[in-house]
Amino acid sequence: GSLAAAVAAMPAMAQEGDVRVIRAAVVGCGGRGVGGGYKPKSEQDYYRMGALGNLIQAAAELAKQGIKVKVQPVAFADYFLEKAKAAAEKFGAPAANAFGGANGYKQAIDRPDVDVVILTTPLNFRPRHTMFAVQHGKHVFAEKGVAVDAPGVREMIAASKLAAEKKLSIVCGTQRRHQRGYLLVKKALDEGKLGTILGGAVYWNGDVPWVAGRNKDESNASYLCKNWLNFTELSGDHICEQHVHNIDVANWFIGRYPKTVVAVGTRARRVSGNQYDGFSGDFDYGEGVHIHSMCRQVNACANNVSEFFRTDKAILTGTSAKSLDKKWIPLEGDFIDLNPYVVEHMDLLKSILGKGPYLNEGEACAMSTACGVMLRIAAYTGQMVAM
C-alpha cells in the first residue's frame, strides 16, 4: 500500500557495527542552529552548539542508557553561504556539503545520506522547509514558532499530517513539553489531582535580544534575513517567535485552544524593524476560562518569563503546585531530569529509532503559533480575532 511505498522510499539509516548512525542536515546556521561562531573546547561544551549540538548530546545520553546511536552532521544550508561553510567546517562536514541562497535548503535536505533535518531559519520559512523535508522522507526538528501567518500555519499542519502518514517524526522547539517540572504538573492535571483550570496568565517580558545593522548597498532580502528577529514578516513578531513557549503551555495544560482573543499593543522604544514593544491580550478558551497573555521586549524593565494557573483545587506555576491554603502539593512521575533542550532531542531520536513513543508535534506547535498570530492581529487592528 501507500504506507509500504513511503517506507520503502525512506533512506536506510547507516550502521557502524551495532551503532545506528543518524545523519543530520541543518538549515539555518546561526546561534539557534549551530551555536553561531562558538567552537567547543570539549564534549561537555556541545550544549552551547545550538540544536545540532543538543542532538549530538542527546545521542551520547541515549548511549548511556544502552541505546546505541550516534549523530553524524552531513550537510548545512543558510541564506548566507559563509555561515553554512563555517558550520560545516566546525562540525567536520565537507565544504561541498554547504549551501547558500534562498534555495540552498533543497540541496541540503534532498540527499540520500540525510535522515533528520534541523530547521532553525527565521519563522517565515519554517512551513515551506518542513513540507519539503517531509515530502522527501526526512524526520524533522522544527524550532518554534513555526509560521508567521495563517497560510503558514495551515501549511505546517498539512506537513504534520503528511508526516503522520509517512511515520516521520517531528519535534518542535517547545522544550517545556520535555521538561520534568512541566511534565509532572501536566501528569497531575490529567490524573485529576490538581483540579480543573479556571484561568491564568502567561508571560514573556524581557529585553530586546539583538539588532543587526544594515550594510551600505545591502539588498532588502539580505538585510531582512540578517535582521529577521526585528521584522514581523520574518519573525511573526516576538509573540510568535518567543512568547509562543508560554502560550503553548496554556494550550497543553488546558487541553484545548482558545476560541477568541482581544488585545492591545504598543511600539515606542524599538530602534529597528517594525515589531511592537509589547502585547497584552485576553484569550477566551470557552467555559469561562480566560488566560491573560503578556509579552514585552523593552530593556531595563521588570522581567518575567512564567506561567500561572488557578484551578478549583490549586494554584499552579508551570512546574509547581500549591493547595489553596498554600501548602506544596507533591508531584510524582518518572521523567528524566536533564537539560530540556537535550531531552527534546533524546525523545526525537527515540521516536525515529522506535525506542520510544512516536512524536509528531507539528500540529500542536502550529496551533500555538496560530494563537500568537491571532493576538498579534488583534493588537494591530483593535478587533476581536477568532480561531
What is each stretch, according to the model?
Residues L3-F91, A250:
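N-terminal Rossmann-like dinucleotide-binding module
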